């Protein structure tokens, strides 16, 4: 779980330390493993990343002939397993594997963003793959995300005489109706279609059971397409909500992360091998890597629709297929393959 990755980081470090030819560096619970590449590679510098943490939930796992079940099986222990399996191979291209903590929580705790001077190492790559679950498709870019808080004001009164006040909870209804009518765009960018969403995610209002409340708060999460900046997305949302607000109401931006640019350049062979390409619905660290100037995609085993659910699973066949696709794309020296 996020913030409790020490044991799995120790396990991954021990496994990587057994791989001949790999350099392993640890920064807190982030692991960076580097491979120099073979002499007959393409000359590319490839970066593969995966997060160690999971969302909260029930621990334990099960296995049958076809699947592995349990918290994080899909998001994203399957991807981590593929990364470790790649470390068994004699890769043709220079490759860096980064295993990092706290992706599922606040941006400032994310291990990929806490590398300090080592962040330059990430930027010194030609292409990057984030092994998030994509069900074997190559997913380009990612949505941006922002969370805003709306504070609505009314006038307090006794519930036996509600006409003497203005119920702030009643005002939530008109705002929510406006939210429901928001134009959730589906722009086509880089030959893939991004589907926007705007969701109410939290409400608060209470004084006492015999008081008409004079305050109510509503939180909204807007997942926006990569053709908008954070500022543009916020302006678009505020402009839509504003007609239902009074001068006393406020809108506060509490959290935001930029979208990731969809860029298939450098991934043509991987896309052909995967057989499917689409937009990434959701935010991933493709946004962060793209911001460093590294063309990046999402590609990994597991159905993203099962992520964060109470019935996560990953097919063993999906692990094999993802490993085969990445091995083919990077290139393997079969004659020098490690045991």
Task: Go through each PLM region and give its residues.
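Acidic-glycine-rich active-site phosphate/pyrophosphate-binding loop
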Residues: 49-64, 125, 140-151, 297
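Fold-independent oxyanion-binding glycine-rich loops
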Residues: 27-29, 50-52, 101-102, 127, ...
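Acidic/histidine-rich catalytic neighborhood of metal-dependent amide-processing enzymes
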Residues: 81-147, 190
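Metal-dependent amide/peptide-bond hydrolase catalytic core
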Residues: 4-7, 23-25, 133-134, 140-141, ...
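Buried hydrophobic packing segments
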Residues: 12, 80-87, 115, 172-175, ...
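Generic recognition of long tandem-repeat/solenoid scaffolds
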Residues: 31-35, 66-73, 243, 248
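A non-catalytic alpha/beta surface segment that caps or lines the substrate-entry region
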Residues: 1-42
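Active-site metal-coordination/substrate-binding segment of hydrolases
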Residues: 42-99, 107, 111
């Amino acid at each position: 779980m996020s913030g409790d990755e020490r044991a799995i980081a120790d396990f991954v470090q021990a496994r990587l330390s057994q791989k001949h030819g790999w350099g392993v560096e640890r920064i807190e619970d982030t692991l960076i493993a580097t491979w120099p590449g073979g002499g007959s590679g393409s000359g590319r510098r490839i970066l593969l990343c995966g997060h160690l943490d999971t969302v909260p939930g029930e621990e334990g796992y099960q296995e049958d002939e076809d699947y592995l079940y349990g918290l994080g099986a899909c998001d994203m222990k399957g991807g981590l397993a593929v990364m470790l399996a790649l470390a068994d191979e004699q890769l043709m291209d220079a490759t860096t594997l980064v295993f990092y903590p706290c992706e599922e929580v606040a941006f400032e705790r994310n291990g990929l963003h806490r590398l300090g001077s080592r962040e330059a190492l990430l930027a010194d790559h030609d292409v990057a793959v984030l092994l998030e679950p994509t069900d074997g498709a190559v997913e380009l870019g990612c949505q941006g995300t922002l969370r805003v808080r709306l504070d609505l004001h009314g006038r307090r009164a006794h519930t036996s005489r509600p006409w003497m006040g203005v119920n702030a909870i009643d005002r939530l209804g008109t705002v929510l109706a406006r939210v429901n009518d928001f134009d959730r765009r589906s722009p086509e960018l880089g030959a893939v279609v991004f589907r926007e969403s705007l969701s109410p995610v939290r409400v608060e209002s209470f004084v006492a059971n015999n008081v008409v409340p004079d305050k109510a708060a509503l939180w909204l999460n807007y997942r926006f397409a990569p053709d908008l900046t954070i500022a543009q997305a916020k302006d678009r949302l505020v402009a839509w909500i504003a007609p239902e607000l009074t001068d006393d109401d406020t809108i506060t931006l509490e959290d935001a992360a930029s979208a990731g640019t969809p860029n298939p350049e450098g991934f043509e062979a991987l896309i052909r091998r995967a057989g499917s390409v689409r937009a990434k619905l959701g935010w991933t660290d493709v946004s962060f890597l793209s911001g460093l100037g590294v063309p990046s995609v999402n590609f990994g085993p597991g159905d993203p629709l099962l992520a964060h659910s109470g019935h996560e699973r990953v097919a063993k066949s999906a692990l094999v297929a993802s490993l085969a696709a990445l091995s083919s794309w990077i290139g393997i020296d079969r004659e020098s393959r490690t045991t």
